[in-house]
């Protein structure tokens, strides 16, 4: 991430300068942007845990603009979303593809949103292997296990059958925000922030 904007806030004690992400965190907004890897996941998990410690009853907003990424990194975010007490609402801004779409669907029921011109894409896990045949078999079995796990969670989150999810994730399956709502990955397409 290149340039990070700063905002200045006037308080009783004078002016205070924040980077924009710290300011958003004050409002319980976490931004998941770009490829999901271990570093990004650790940052998201830390922010979720921090916000739970600040107020375990108040919702957290997870804004997603991501092409996806590493499955285990994404699953660490998913597990933390389920582990913490506050509801995590998810909002797609731009795109939620692959693991990004998976996490979008994992928001609290009734609190999964997308902006109108965002795109959502689901597909099966990607992976590669090299080495001895037995090593390739081990990796292949693990990818198939993760595929089954993610399809099962997507089916539960969307209300689609496991068979339908398996069919749709066999290749890249793109949806508009409206189509993602009809599919069950989100609950509402947001036109205006009513805060």
UniProtKB/Swiss-Prot annotation:
- What reaction(s) does this enzyme catalyze? Hydrolysis of proteins to small peptides in the presence of ATP and magnesium. alpha-casein is the usual test substrate. In the absence of ATP, only oligopeptides shorter than five residues are hydrolyzed (such as succinyl-Leu-Tyr-|-NHMec, and Leu-Tyr-Leu-|-Tyr-Trp, in which cleavage of the -Tyr-|-Leu- and -Tyr-|-Trp bonds also occurs)
- Residues of the active site: 98 (nucleophile), 123
The EC number of this protein is: 3.4.21.92
The GO annotation for biological process reads: protein quality control for misfolded or incompletely synthesized proteins
Q: Which GO terms describe its molecular function?
A: ATP-dependent peptidase activity; ATPase binding; serine-type endopeptidase activity
- Localization per Swiss-Prot or TrEMBL: Cytoplasm
The record's GO CC annotations read: cytoplasm; endopeptidase Clp complex
Record's superkingdom? Bacteria
What is the uppermost EC class here?
A: hydrolase
Q: Which UniProt keywords apply?
A: Cytoplasm, Hydrolase, Protease, Serine protease
- What is the documented function of this protein? Cleaves peptides in various proteins in a process that requires ATP hydrolysis. Has a chymotrypsin-like activity. Plays a major role in the degradation of misfolded proteins.
Supply the PANTHER family for this chain. ATP-DEPENDENT CLP PROTEASE PROTEOLYTIC SUBUNIT
Could you describe the subunit structure of this protein? Fourteen ClpP subunits assemble into 2 heptameric rings which stack back to back to give a disk-like structure with a central cavity, resembling the structure of eukaryotic proteasomes.
Q: Which family does it belong to?
A: Belongs to the peptidase S14 family.
Task: Write the protein's name.
Answer: ATP-dependent Clp protease proteolytic subunit
Give the taxonomic lineage as stored in the record. Bacteria, Pseudomonadati, Campylobacterota, Epsilonproteobacteria, Campylobacterales
Gene from which the chain derives: clpP
């Amino acid at each position: 991430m290149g340039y990070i904007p700063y905002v200045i806030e006037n308080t009783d004690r004078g002016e205070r300068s924040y980077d924009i992400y710290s300011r958003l965190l004050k409002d319980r907004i976490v931004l998941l942007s770009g490829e999901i890897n271990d570093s990004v996941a650790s940052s998201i998990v830390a922010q979720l845990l921090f916000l739970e410690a600040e107020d375990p009853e108040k919702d957290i907003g997870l804004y997603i603009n991501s092409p996806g990424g590493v499955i285990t990194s994404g699953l660490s975010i998913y597990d933390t979303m389920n582990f913490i007490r506050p509801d995590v609402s998810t909002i797609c801004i731009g795109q939620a593809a692959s693991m990004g779409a998976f996490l979008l669907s994992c928001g609290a029921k009734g609190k999964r949103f997308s902006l109108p011109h965002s795109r959502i894409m689901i597909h099966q896990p990607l992976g590669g292997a090299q080495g001895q045949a037995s090593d390739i078999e081990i990796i292949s079995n693990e990818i198939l296990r993760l595929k089954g796990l993610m399809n099962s969670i997507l089916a539960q989150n969307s209300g689609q059958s496991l068979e339908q999810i398996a069919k749709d994730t066999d290749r890249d399956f793109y949806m508009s925000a409206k189509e993602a709502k009809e599919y069950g990955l989100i609950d509402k397409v947001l036109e205006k922030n009513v805060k």
